[in-house]
Amino acid sequence: MAAPQITLSVLVIALLTCSVTAYPNGKVPMSCGGMIPQHNHSPQSEPIHQITVSQTTFKPGDQIEVTLSGPPFRGFLLEARDAENLSGPPIGSFTLIDSEESQLLTCTDVQGLAVSHTRSSKKTEIKVYWDAPSPAPDHIRFLATVVQKFKIYWVKIPSPVISQPNAPPFTTPKATTQPLTTPPSVSHLTKPFSAFECGNKKFCVRSPLNCDPEKEPACVFLSFTRDNQSVMVEMSGPSDGYVSFAFSHDQWMGDDDAYLCIREDQTVDIQPSYLTGRSYPVMDSRGTLEDMAWRLADGVIQCSFRRNITLPEAKNRFVLNESYYIFFAEGPSHDGRIFRHSQQPLITYEKYNVTDTPKSVGGSRSSPLLKAHGALMFVAWMTTVSIGVLVARFFRSVWSKAFFLREAAWFQVHRMLMVATSLLTCVAFVLPFVYRGGWSWRAGYHPYLGCTVMTLAVLQPLLATFRPPLHDPRRQVFNWTHWSVGTAARIIAVAAMFLGMDLPGLNLPSPQKTYAMMGFVVWHIGTEVILEIHAYRLSRKVEILDNDRIQILQSLTVAEAEGHVFKKVVLAVYICGNVIFLSIFLSAINHI
């Protein structure tokens, strides 16, 4: 596996839509030769559509009406070939009858050699004219590829042969007959899987650890039970599209032996596949699987199958008596076509041999580096910076006469917390680059906001080292600059945290993460508002009487004492609440 595991991205990122070659607009000139859609599925064997022609003989220059018809289909590709050399290039050109549903294609730099659809709407009939070239082969056969769904299509459906008047009789080439293969049977599961024998007879991968799919629909469950020279596999997970797992030599995606259970309407298609990097999985024959069964209930997809431990004839199937990392992913699908999953796959912490001693293991959906990045940023921008700001803004008078290392205590506390914030940010900033090996292009605005926060976090302590003396005229400018940079950093950091929680590399539980972050913001703003109101009311208690220009301060000492106690209580309560919110996020990170 050569490509780094996506953080967002995937086991079966394999399941990336961006890599799927599907053309709803019908512009498929690259398919002119083989006429095979690049859908990574096997074509159907028995055609249910037909091609008819308006005449069975032709001369060069004739225009023949060709009709493709049958049950509703969404896409098609129509060509004329030399009937005695169907693998040869397209012959002649086409003229459109309905330009809303069909269009001419350019093949081998010649316009009009083929016709395809213009849109993916359902259609039951397409009519075009074929213009016979001069010179022309003695016999012509039309071929059509028809797409009903993404994974249901027919390739090179033949038409009756049309011939020139004086041509020798057409002889159908002898076809090499192949024995018909009966597709493997698929049954319906009557009850959900159970985790009862996990660790005894079954090797199980579960998330949350020790969950039971029989009792918990949200349980991600994968089990392997050895039976002589085969392994029975059970897979279950909440999804409306597909669930999948893969065996991998490392924790990066690519070159993996994967298996998908894809929902199609009210059935499930069980499909072995092979992952090559971040591209769409290459679907393989189901002939390697036996005893296939599936079940749909309560938003959960469950499927099972049996596979031999060794498959010498199957190129991309791994032997199962070796150790691998195990991936589990789920995501959306439509008409049998799978799409990129929104969160990282579950990946076991180490390699396991599923045919060895039965165990019950778990995994993680996030890299330890990304977990550390998120945890450090939460500590820095939820806790240390927030407490540091409150101390500097509201507690100067409380600890103005207390000193620590020859500086006011409030200032030393503020400075230590802010230095801690900058150091935590610097360490956390590096971790995603180490994990990704560079810039993360799929992370949206989060990395840009993160770079901005990093810049401000470094700039802020540098500005503080040039702080002018207390009575210096430049002190006012410094104060405003210092406040502006700090406030901007905090606002951008909160925005970055909101976005980062949704990235595939972390993807904390929804909607709890949003409520928790909103709760933290309200908690902090509410605390600042309370302290501001208190400061205003305290100033109102100090009555200034102007009598012969002599100021008399009434009860100043008592008011200040009362104010200091109140502020300390508010700070203690705030820190407790802050730590609770921080613990919620750190716990969520630990459990993904």
Swiss-Prot record:
Topology term for the membrane: Multi-pass membrane protein
Where the record annotates domain DOMON, the positions are 216-331
Q: Where in the cell is it found?
A: Membrane
GO CC entries: membrane
EC number assigned by the record: 1.-.-.-
UniProt binding sites for heme b 2: H414, H482
Which residue numbers delimit the Cytochrome b561 domain? 335-534
The note on the cofactor says: Binds 2 heme b groups non-covalently.
Key word Nucleotide-binding present: no
This molecule's function is given as:
Ferric-chelate reductases reduce Fe(3+) to Fe(2+) before its transport from the endosome to the cytoplasm.
Q: What is this protein called?
A: Ferric-chelate reductase 1
List the source organism.
Answer: Mus musculus
